[in-house]
A protein has these predicted regions:
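Conserved, mostly hydrophobic/aromatic
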Residues: 31, 68, 106, 114, ...
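Histidine/lysine/aspartate-rich catalytic loop segments that bind and position anionic ligands
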Residues: 93-122
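Alpha-helix-loop-beta-strand connector modules within alpha/beta enzyme cores
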Residues: 44-60, 88-100, 128-152, 186
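Glycine-rich phosphate-binding active-site loops on the catalytic face of alpha/beta enzymes
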Residues: 76-87, 115-127, 152-186
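Structural motif
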Residues: 25-26, 71, 109, 142, ...
Length: 186
């Protein structure tokens, strides 16, 4: 029941969303801090960053270059709506995309990895439609960068991820809903 991938990306909205102490030390895990609400203090983020360093997790900040520099994050996560170019900052960049046009935009921004959204059907009201394994594999063959699937990944379709032509996977809401999924993955 294990999924063997080279990279695991976990989205968090605050530092209390995930307890890093329960995860095993692993170089393959990357945590993306994506806070759209109330900004946490720099002290809390620095403490969380140090915990990630101890566990050998990579830590990325979403769409905030100054905060990424202040926290000494491993890189910057660029959302699909963010069109700025960060080539001159010498950071590890991860992008997010929903279609082929956005993938090429992220390549121009300098992203080495793109998290491509909705692999499976999700339970959100306004977000309908999904790619499926076959369409994702066809798109990933045409891209020169690493595409990481996101969306709809849950306990019931974990084994389908072995068929996905990708070096990793990304989890957003499943970690918050059912933390036990992390035991099956890592």
């Amino acid at each position: 029941m294990f999924i063997i991938k080279n990279n695991y990306f976990l989205y968090i909205e605050n530092t209390q969303s995930i307890n890093v102490d329960f995860l095993k030390s692993n170089k393959k895990i990357s945590i993306i801090y994506r806070n759209n609400g109330i900004q946490e203090s720099l002290v809390k983020l620095s403490i969380f960053r140090n915990k990630c360093k101890i566990k050998r997790f990579k830590f990325y900040i979403a769409n905030n270059l100054q905060l990424a520099k202040n926290c000494q994050a491993d890189g910057l996560y660029i959302s699909a709506y963010n069109k700025k170019k960060y080539l001159k900052y010498n950071l590890n960049l991860i992008g997010s995309a929903h279609n082929y046009k956005e993938i090429h935009g992220k390549i121009k921004q300098g992203c080495k990895t793109v998290i491509f959204s909705r692999l499976f059907k999700t339970s959100y009201k306004n977000k309908k439609g999904s790619l499926g394994v076959i369409k994702f594999n066809l798109i990933s063959q045409n891209c020169l960068i690493n595409l990481i699937p996101l969306g709809g990944i849950n306990i019931f379709n974990l084994l389908k991820l072995n068929m996905v032509n990708s070096e990793g996977l990304a989890l957003l809401s499943e970690i918050k809903k059912k933390p036990a999924i992390s035991n099956r993955l890592f």
